[in-house]
Amino acid sequence: MDPNTVSSFQDILVRMSKMQLTSSSEDLNGMITQFESLKLYRDSLGETVMRMGDFHSLQIRNGKWREQLSQKFEEIRWLIEEVRHRLKITENSFEQITFMQALQLLLEVEQEIRAFSFQLI
């Protein structure tokens, strides 16, 4: 796993947790939770690819991994749209920078998960 991606996730999560948006903080907490979940999923998928022999154990352990993958892509798309929306409505430069970095990270992670999944198929 790329150490820059890890630090990017951690940096964005810390920044988001410090933000006090005028909108519901529950929405932001939900985004943070989904970011954390996405990071864990990406990490576990990456580890599985690194140990290609684990693909069979992944299939045995979770026969619905394709369905899970599809759900993660839906979550990513939702997060991308939510981050884009937040980026459009915020006027605070700290928040704008945070959301721009979050958007870039989401696009990178989506690409990485696609690459991992193609290796597993």
From Swiss-Prot:
GO cellular component, one term: host cell nucleus
Localisation per UniProt entry: Virion; Host nucleus
Primary localization class, coarse: virion
SUPFAM superfamilies to which the protein is assigned, alphabetical: Nonstructural protein ns2, Nep, M1-binding domain
Motif extent (Nuclear export signal): 12-21, 85-94
GO BP: exit of virus from host cell nucleus through nuclear pore
Domain of life: Viruses
InterPro entries (alphabetical): Flu_NS2
Swiss-Prot/TrEMBL keywords: Host nucleus, Host-virus interaction, Transport, Virion
HAMAP family associated with the record: INFV_NEP
Entry function: Mediates the nuclear export of encapsidated genomic RNAs (ribonucleoproteins, RNPs). Acts as an adapter between viral RNPs complexes and the nuclear export machinery of the cell. Possesses no intrinsic RNA-binding activity, but includes a C-terminal M1-binding domain. This domain is believed to allow recognition of RNPs bound to the protein M1.
Other known facts: Average number present in a viral particle is estimated to be 130-200 molecules.
Assembly, per entry: Interacts with protein M1. May interact with host nucleoporin RAB/HRB and exportin XPO1/CRM1.
Similarity comment: family membership: Belongs to the influenza viruses NEP family.
Protein name (Swiss-Prot/TrEMBL): Nuclear export protein
Organism of origin: Influenza A virus (strain A/Chicken/Shantou/4231/2003 H5N1 genotype V)
